[in-house]
Amino acid sequence: MAKKGKLTPMMQQYMQIKEENKDCILFYRLGDFYEMFFDDALTASKELEITLTGKNCGLEERAPMCGVPYHAVDSYLNKLVEKGYKVGICEQVEDPSQAKGIVKREIVRIVTPGTNISQQSLDDEKNNYLMCIFASDGSYGISFVDVTTGDFRTTSMDSLAKVRDEIFKFEPAEIICNDAFLISGMDFDYLKDKMSIVISSIEPYHFDEEQAEERIKRQFKVGNLEGLGLVDYPMGVIATGALLGYLHETQKSSLDHLMHIDAYETSEFMIIDSSSRRNLELCETLRDKQKKGSLLWVLDKTKTAMGARMLRNMVEQPLVDKKKIEERYDAITTLTNQTIVREELREYLNPIYDLERLMTKVSYKTANPRDMIAFKTSLELLPAIKTILEECKDPLLSGLREDLDPLEDIHDLLEDSIIEEPPLAIKEGGIIKEGFKDDIDQLKRAKTEGKQWLMELEEREREKTGIKNLKIKYNKVFGYYLDVTNSYKDLVPNYYIRKQTLANSERYTTEELNQLADTILGSEDRLYALEYETYVTIRETLAGEMERISRTANVIAQIDAMASFAYVAERNHFVRPKLNVRGTIDIKDGRHPVVEQVIPNDMFISNDTYLDNKKNRVAIITGPNMAGKSTYMRQVALIVLMAQIGSFVPAAKANIGIVDRIFTRVGASDDLASGQSTFMVEMSEVANILRNATKNSLLILDEIGRGTSTFDGLSIAWAVVEYISNSKLLGAKTLFATHYHELTELEGKIDSVHNYCIAVKEQGDDIVFLRKIVKGGADKSYGVQVAKLAGVPDAVINRAKEIARELEEHDLTSGAKDIMPYGEAQQLSFFRESDEPTMEHPFMAELREKDLSDMTPLEALNYLYVLQEKLKNEE
């Protein structure tokens, strides 16, 4: 970077502003372009694929430079922000005609991934959160906001795992934090690389507790924190204050649209850890990260962007409060029973624009006249929606009707003031309706009639002078003038004042034309200025009503979400679940909500499920791969989750005991980036489940122990089942799929464990998966048959059958003995003891004396060979 002393005055100004904003790419306004210089130009030209040029800057070498036109800045800005850059918008803040020297410029806004308000780059159906995390001595404060909608929340928590779960739940675009969080052990590479979250630490002064409280009180205009419900969230208060400080520094505005903050406890909602969210594919699929194929894809048939975001939030945060869940059920029941009412509502909801994000544009003073028309056309629909809701008598919908403010005064203001098809620009007139403001009407008449005045003057001058082709013309340099061709210049009278001589004509003016031009041009300038001033006043009026508009937007979102749930329930034959506090999960003819959408002709096979907290805690599920075990288990988890969202469920009947958490351990994939093997990842997830599950949790465990040797894997799986089923240790309701058929022996040994399997029909050497869960354990794995179905060559299949027969003849577990209950003093053994007393082999004593911990793997292997040779010699 160059030294400022050698630079031109303009470049010195640029360098001074850049010095104060080193972490930004600076968009420096120069006329009709935003220019970038030096390193910023090198970066931006590469990322935006635009031409890199140079500019004389006072140095020997030209400064690298690139630029983008101001009218197309959003698309370029969005590209940089989506790539994780911060962009500082540097505008001219004084009229160049009034400037003495260099035009004054300032940063008016810093755009970051979490503060981008451009609707071109944002997903209408998803919030764009900026999250702040404050870490101190093992405690954490989290605060996050969507500046485009005003959604603002905070909480405090006591573990990094909970912080991780919140990050996965809300998927912020950007995280700011203190330095302590950067060394907390969070997997930042995953957050950056897999979730595309931009993460940065901010200055320590942002996290000063006293300053944080003051920022909060100023923002929400309160004298203390009690009224905001923040007193019990000290860590959240610090995070919120830091977040507000960062927003004020980057947005350079008052942020008046951030009017409320919601302090919440994670215990208010079902806890679903990050792994379970991925495995259950709540909002996006595991494979391609798309909405299609997820639970949200099935449930979201909303008509508005606000409703889509609301419904997504409901899916992300299932409830645990029975009363709140039942309220949603009642609303859905009303809307499924009253089909005409529901469809009328959806018809009126469909044209409503995104009021929340329109309000943010009003707050940021970027709302254009067409945004105002979008507001008006949306508000026109509210009275009809309020009237339709009179037919709905359930508490939730009745309450929403009462809360729905039709905003008729705002609608009338916009109806009276803004023309139906206004321009985008706000400084070039053509915005305000005739009859709204007398001064504007008079100036419009002057502008319109001025053209007639010019035509009349032109005609008079032709008659007076005899110049038949005399015309009054206009350009920006001379304004209005009389144009006389050379063939008539001898007829020009003395009172004509020459302005310009051209090859074929002369240009003149007169006193009368000058006066008329002043009137016309002055009226046009005054008209544009007065229309702009009036438009700004209208926009400020809307800004003063933000709280009312925000409440109405929230009501519309809730109505839309409830109508979507009802529509989906009716179309897919979902039923209203019953809720119980006994902990029983009783599902009749349950179906997978997503899979049944993609299977043609109602071919999905439904299944029953019964789990409780006493005699039916653990269901061990055996059966071949591809038979449907994983689909069935996910199905049960999704039905429970849907029930607690407040949605109806895919089943003939369902009675659901409210669960506090759902954990899933499904599938395996090496976490190579962090150096963890498949088995290590599996065991870490199992450890997390066993540490954090409660007796009120639902566990979905698939193939525990398959990432290691057969006996180790079986041992671990066995021990996990014993631990989970023991009410003194855990006692959680669990679906446990396994290929270890030995685990079926636990039925009868542990009262709360029962066997189930996937029914299979054998047809010679072939099998047919019936997809039906039946009682009892599978007697075969059918692995060879599955391999055949998968297309493995016949030669391999035939050889596999031979090997399978040989192994069956030497069954290693045929002598397994009874397993003692968990916790008894004696070690458990998988091998049945002989009834006859046995003599210890001499090698056993020798082996017992060996210190294996001092042996290298090679030494241990050599020792094993020695023992083997001795045994062979004995034979």
Please describe what each predicted stretch is.
Residues 2-334, 350, 354-363, 367-459, ...:
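Charged catalytic and DNA/RNA-contacting regions of genome-maintenance
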Residues 38-39, 233, 303-304, 314, ...:
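ATPase nucleotide-binding head domains, primarily ABC-like/P-loop NTPase cores
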Residues 90, 113-122, 254, 390-396, ...:
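Active-site phosphate-binding and catalytic loops of NTP-dependent enzymes
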Residues 167, 172-180, 186-189, 201, ...:
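Conserved catalytic alpha/beta cores of large enzymes that bind or transform nucleotide phosphates
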Residues 325, 332, 342-348, 375, ...:
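Amphipathic alpha-helical coiled-coil segments
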Residues 840-875:
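C-terminal tails and terminal domains of large nucleic-acid-associated
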